Amino acid sequence: MTKLRKIIHIDMDYFFAQVEEKANPSLKDKPFAVGGTNPKRGVISTCNYIAREYGVRSAMPTAIAMQKCPNLILLNTDFAKYKAASAVIRDIFYYFTDKVEPLSLDEAYLDVTDVKEYKNSATLIAQAIKQEIFNKTGLTGSAGVAPNKLLAKIASDINKPNGLYVVTPKQVDSFVKDLPVKKLFGVGKVSQEKLKSMGVETCLDLQQLSLATLVDKFGKFGSSLYNYARGIDNREVNPVRIRKSVSVENTYLEDLKTLGACLEKLPSLYDKLTSRMTEEHYKSIIGIVVKFTDTKFNKTSLTRVAKILDKEMLKNLIIELHQKRNHPIRLIGIGVKLGEIDDKQMDLF
């Protein structure tokens, strides 16, 4: 019989903005956002919940955010501050278990299956972690507790902010049936639209499709979809998690018709990329890459061997790549390649 696992996913609430709020309490009752300080070309990194009440969201162009909330306060990103807070939080995770898989500065998976303290209750452990984070940093985070990573991550988003949601093994079937398929790991806009064209919008809909059909339509990922629709996820929490790459991309509502327009997007993409990187990622960089998709959906990318994340090199790659394209740009992606791998295999996207 397979041993039931106890997985916790911790996701800090509006992390960058919350850190800024803690540093400057006068912001607490005001709508504010981090990043996107250029009102014409900027993009919001994150915002507090007061700003969200006005409709402001992460990745929203600053111009639109200011239309929705004219009195929105814009702050520059301060990654040194965010990384310092993240280091304290991560130390707390390791106090409770060695099985920690960081995903970014503000979220991680923890496997507490073998933790004997707190009556071996994942719920009590999650409560203790949240309390310890608050005691040491003054920050709140939300936790999801479930038998696997898939469900724990989904659960952590349910009662935000400062939430805790538990999915017990007996609740898995009822929990997943009404879940939108877009909540499933690996389902992006393309997969979501493809599933929708097949009449699939919820996990219950997805359960009606055979394994053979899903593999035929989605290849290897079809097998994962088949399991995810049933709340099954066998991925382990990997405490020595080795990522082959970290990348970000953005699709723009208005086509980028000039090199200058493309270069103006680099700062926000760079901030977004660095926010997803841990200290371990920085130590194992072997290359950087830039990708374009034009208005005719042609994809082009360039890579360079590099040991550091160099914004100037990214800028030069954008310039070089732009010279190869004859059409306006719809999407820009940037990223780093990690680990020891042949340069010819540097395809992040």
Swiss-Prot record:
InterPro entries with a match to the protein in the record? DNA/RNA_pol_sf, DNA_pol_Y-fam_lit_finger_sf, DNA_pol_Y-fam_little_finger, DNA_polymerase-Y, DNApol_IV, IMS_HHH_1, Rev_trsase/Diguanyl_cyclase, UmuC
Q: Where is this site: Substrate discrimination?
A: 16
Database matches in Gene3D superfamilies: 3.30.70.270, 3.40.1170.60, 5' to 3' exonuclease, C-terminal subdomain (1.10.150.20), DNA polymerase, Y-family, little finger domain (3.30.1490.100)
Q: Record's Gene Ontology CC terms?
A: cytosol
Function as written in the Swiss-Prot or TrEMBL entry: Poorly processive, error-prone DNA polymerase involved in untargeted mutagenesis. Copies undamaged DNA at stalled replication forks, which arise in vivo from mismatched or misaligned primer ends. These misaligned primers can be extended by PolIV. Exhibits no 3'-5' exonuclease (proofreading) activity. May be involved in translesional synthesis, in conjunction with the beta clamp from PolIII.
| Family of this protein | Belongs to the DNA polymerase type-Y family.
The record's note on quaternary structure and interaction partners says: Monomer.
Q: Please report the name of this protein according to its UniProt entry.
A: DNA polymerase IV
